[in-house]
From Swiss-Prot:
Main subcellular location of this protein, as a coarse class: membrane
Subunit structure: F-type ATPases have 2 components, CF(1) - the catalytic core - and CF(0) - the membrane proton channel. CF(1) has five subunits: alpha(3), beta(3), gamma(1), delta(1), epsilon(1). CF(0) has three main subunits: a(1), b(2) and c(9-12). The alpha and beta chains form an alternating ring which encloses part of the gamma chain. CF(1) is attached to CF(0) by a central stalk formed by the gamma and epsilon chains, while a peripheral stalk is formed by the delta and b chains.
Organism: Sorangium cellulosum (strain So ce56)
E.C. numbers: 7.1.2.2
Keywords (A to Z) from UniProt: ATP synthesis, ATP-binding, Cell inner membrane, Cell membrane, CF(1), Hydrogen ion transport, Ion transport, Membrane, Nucleotide-binding, Translocase, Transport
Membrane topology: Peripheral membrane protein
Protein name in UniProt: ATP synthase subunit beta
GO molecular function: ATP binding; ATP hydrolysis activity; proton-transporting ATP synthase activity, rotational mechanism
Record InterPro entries: AAA+_ATPase, ATP-synt_VA_C, ATP_synth_F1_bsu, ATPase_a/bsu_AS, ATPase_alpha/beta_chains, ATPase_F1/V1/A1_a/bsu_N, ATPase_F1/V1/A1_a/bsu_N_sf, ATPase_F1/V1/A1_a/bsu_nucl-bd
Binding sites annotated in the UniProt record for ATP: G155, G156, A157, G158, V159, G160, K161, T162
Length: 474
């Protein structure tokens, strides 16, 4: 075991001197005891970032450096940061170095995995292009997710990002028997706490809590930048284990990918790198690429990632969101205007898109129904000014029909969620893709022109609409 001594502390950056010829490798984890954090031994982890000459390294701390003094002993673990992986992590909250922070005792994991590793080699990657069915109508129809793909989730505060994430976790557990991993990167601790409590209270079909199928890895706003820039990698290591060792289709949620970049830029400046555009780190695209390339389908299983993306000052050309966009297969945009209409999930069908919506992938029927739905909704949007000024009576008969169908489509895009059952009083619905396509096709073909539009609101498939209509008629 190689032992070094602290020579300098600059905020979250710590310089350590080692005996000549015994320098730890870049990305190795070093451990020491910081009495200011707790009385536990080896409670502070440092990650080697740079070699400074023959005997000194510059490291980034994963926790507070308050209380460190020069001359303190630091030992080299000889390997990268290792986190516990496997079923023992489900239902637990861990921090960036895999220590449980939910006060529920230690994690008795049989295996640990390094947070840094190479993406799967080409020979192991799956070349099959498969749709990842979520059971949520608007997503499956308009912006289908790719198995092993990356999805950007855009939305302001209070439009339903968390509920959508909860429902996806629930549906993955139900439909695919799969697990989810949630990385809380630089967001509010209160939100992380709320998510844990909501997942503990929401129930799966078999009555067990949603949390029993998810692992939560948190590095929130109050953490040093070292922890925030690495916590997404810790979560990815947990997800990769379920994919590679247990052959599962895993959902990885990252909230928020912008904070990952932001933390990287804080660390970069402290390491003395010359900043590039807008003050971001010069290694921005390399760091993002190293993270995103590990999210993929292999011949054993897949990691599908849903990433919430904060857009600073609503500027889509900012280097941080722009770098993330390059990796996305689909975007799901949540709209406040739609949530104000009481339509949940508040996904904007005209703004959301996916590379999977291609007739060669999803088939001619799915593609044409999705495009017809968008055309109808776009026409309705164009007519809204006329309706607001002159009223419905001034429209042609054709346009009146378009408006009536568009309003039914809009209502039918809503759906009762399992995890929101306690708010809506309605049982959640998981709608198979073929039922979704058939339902929208019937509306577009005018087969349901006689049905009142309120019968389309918060239902599952088209059979529910017909049942609701006949119930009202009787």
């Amino acid at each position: 075991m190689v032992v070094g001594k602290i020579t300098q502390v600059i905020g979250p950056v710590v310089d350590v001197d080692f005996p000549a010829g015994q320098l730890p490798k870049i990305l190795n984890a070093l451990k020491l005891s910081n009495p200011s954090i707790s009385a536990e031994p080896d409670n502070l982890v440092l990650e080697v970032a740079q070699h400074l000459g023959e005997s000194s390294v510059r490291t980034i701390a994963m926790d507070s450096t308050d209380g460190l003094v020069r001359g303190m002993e630091v030992r080299d673990t000889g390997k990268p940061i290792m986190v516990p992986v496997g079923n023992e992590c489900l239902g637990r909250i861990l921090n960036v170095v895999g220590v449980p922070i939910d006060e529920a005792g230690p994690v008795h994991a049989k295996k640990v995995a390094p947070i840094h590793r190479e993406p799967p080699p080409f020979i192991e990657q799956s070349t099959k292009v498969e749709v990842f069915e979520t059971g949520i109508k608007v997503i499956d129809l308009i912006a289908p997710y790719r198995k092993g793909g990356k999805i950007g989730l855009f939305g302001g505060a209070g439009v339903g990002k968390t509920v959508l994430i909860l429902e996806l976790i629930n549906n993955v557990a139900k439909a695919h028997g799969g697990v989810s991993v949630f990385a809380g990167v630089g967001e509010r601790t209160r939100e992380g706490n709320d998510l844990f409590l909501e997942m503990s209270e929401s129930k799966l079909a078999d009555g067990s809590p949603v949390i029993s199928k998810a692992a939560l890895i948190y590095g929130q706003m109050n953490e040093p930048p070292g922890a925030r820039s690495r916590v997404a990698l810790s979560a990815l290591a947990v997800a990769e284990h379920f994919r590679d060792e247990e052959g599962q289709d895993v959902l990885l949620f990252v909230d928020n990918i912008f904070r990952f970049t932001q933390a990287g830029s804080e660390v970069s400046a402290l390491l003395g790198r010359i900043p590039s555009a807008v003050g971001y780190q010069p290694t921005l695209s390399t760091e993002m690429g190293a993270f995103q390339e590990r999210i993929t389908s292999t011949t054993k299983g897949s990691v599908t990632s849903v990433q919430a993306i904060y857009v600073p000052a609503d500027d889509l050309t900012d280097p941080a969101p722009a770098t993330a966009f390059a990796h996305l297969d689909a975007t799901t945009v949540l709209s406040r205007a739609i949530s104000e209409l009481g339509i949940y999930p508040a996904v904007d069908p005209l703004d959301s898109n996916s590379t999977m919506l291609d007739p060669q992938i999803v088939g001619e029927k799915h593609y044409s129904v999705a495009r017809r739905v968008q055309q109808t909704l776009q026409r309705y949007k164009d007519l809204q000014d006329i309706i607001a000024i002159l009223g419905m009576d001034e429209l042609s008969e054709d346009d009146k029909l378009v408006v009536a169908r568009a309003r039914k489509i809009q209502k039918f895009l809503s759906q009762p969620f399992f995890v929101a059952a306690q708010f809506t009083g309605l049982e959640g619905k998981l709608v198979p893709l073929k039922d979704t396509i058939a339902g929208f096709e019937e509306i577009l073909d005018g087969k349901l022109d006689h049905v009142a539009e309120q019968d389309f609101y918060l239902v599952g498939g088209i059979e529910d609409v017909k049942a609701k209509a006949s119930q009202r008629a009787s």
